[in-house]
Every structure is written in C-alpha cells, then in structure tokens.
Curated annotation (Swiss-Prot):
Role noted for this protein: Involved in ribosome biogenesis, probably through modulation of rDNA transcription.
Keyword Aminoacyl-tRNA synthetase listed: no
Name assigned to this protein: Regulator of rDNA transcription 14
InterPro entries registered for this protein in UniProt: Rrt14 (IPR031404)
Domain of life: Eukaryota
Assigned GO CC terms: nucleolus
Alphabetic keyword roster: Nucleus, Transcription, Transcription regulation
Family matches, as Pfam families: RRT14
Keyword Transcription regulation attributed: yes
Annotated localization: Nucleus, Nucleolus
Similarity comment text for this entry: Belongs to the RRT14 family.
UniProt organism field: Clavispora lusitaniae (strain ATCC 42720)
C-alpha cells in the first residue's frame, strides 16, 4: 500500500494500532518516534497511557482555555476600538457640518474630558507627525471650551440687559430728581437762553 505523505502514513498506523489495542488487550504497539505528531495528538496519547494525573489534565485545559480567552478578548478589543473610531469619525463629520445631535454633543464632551489627561501626558512627544495631531487636538479642545465660555457669557450679558430693561419699563429703577421724559426738578433753562 502506497501512502501519499508521511502524515497520512502516521495517521493510518495510529488508527491500526488503536484498533489492535482495543481488540487485543495484551498487545500495545508503540508508535514509531520517526513520525511527527501534533501537540494535541501527543497530549491525547499521554492521557491514554495515563501518564498525566487529573491535576495535570485540568492545568493543561486551563492553559488552553486562557489562550482562547486571550485571543477572544484581543479580537473584541480590536472591534471595540474600530467601532469607537467609526463613531468618532461620524461625529467629527457632523461637527464640521454643524449638525450635531444632543447625544453626539454629550459623547464629544465626555470624550474630551476622558482624553484631557492623555493629552497632558503626551505633551513630550518627539515624533513631529504625532506632535501635529496633538496640537490640532489641543486647538480643537480649546475652541470648544472657548465656544462654551463665550456662549455662556453672552447668555449672562443678554439676561442682565433684558432684566435691566424690564426693570426700567416697570419703573422699579428710578433716579431721584428725574421724571421720565421731563427735565430734572429745579432745572433752570435761563442759563441756556443767555
């Protein structure tokens, strides 16, 4: 019988040996060491020969599970970063079009607060490209902060002016000696006529 590869030959030998071990209880044919086998095949062979204790088997399964979990977590982290990047780019595009929804404004403010310390820590960067990006981010943050400050200041001034005008209209604010629309009491026009 001709085999197409060494691995197929090793597999067929292993299956025949297993068959003999199950049929004939006294025979145990050891596989030849010349054939290469995978780590799982070696592990299964050791378990079959009962060289591993229960604790060692649990430990091996625990290590395997930890590796799988690590890969899954890395994949999830990459997906999470990608989704955040997409969300940020969408919000950035809406901001440039001045079409931000309240939820997007809230998310942007949260992102600014979250990354403010990172910008401070990254102030000493040697790479000019990264430095340019950081400077752009700083100017964007300052513009947002100044815009917020300017809007609140304008609102306060408008409210103050409105309140002052309302008080004048109601007559709450009055100056002694002045009558609305008339000259002050005791004012002589004689000095102007001379």
């Amino acid at each position: 019988m001709a085999f197409s590869s060494a691995s197929s030959k090793a597999r067929s030998k292993a299956s025949v040996n297993k068959l003999f071990e199950s049929m004939l209880p006294g025979t145990s044919l050891l596989p030849s060491s010349s054939g290469k086998s995978s780590a799982t095949e070696k592990f299964a062979a050791q378990v079959n020969k009962k060289k591993l204790t229960k604790h060692e088997i649990q430990k091996a399964h625990k290590v395997e599970k930890a590796k799988k979990n690590k890969l899954i977590n890395q994949k999830l982290e990459k997906e999470k970063k990608f989704k955040k990047l997409v969300k940020f780019n969408v919000i950035k595009a809406h901001k440039e079009e001045k079409d931000l929804t309240p939820e997007e404004q809230k998310y942007l403010k949260k992102l600014i607060k979250k990354n403010a310390n990172a910008v401070v820590r990254a102030s000493e960067v040697d790479d000019p490209f990264v430095k340019d990006e950081i400077d752009a981010l700083r100017s964007e943050i300052l513009a947002l902060t100044n815009e917020k400050y300017d809007k609140s200041r304008d609102r306060k001034l408008d409210a103050k002016l409105q309140s002052f005008n309302d008080k004048i209209k109601k007559g709450v604010l009055a100056y002694p000696g002045l009558t609305p629309g008339l000259a002050p009491v005791g004012y002589d026009d004689e000095s102007d006529e001379e």
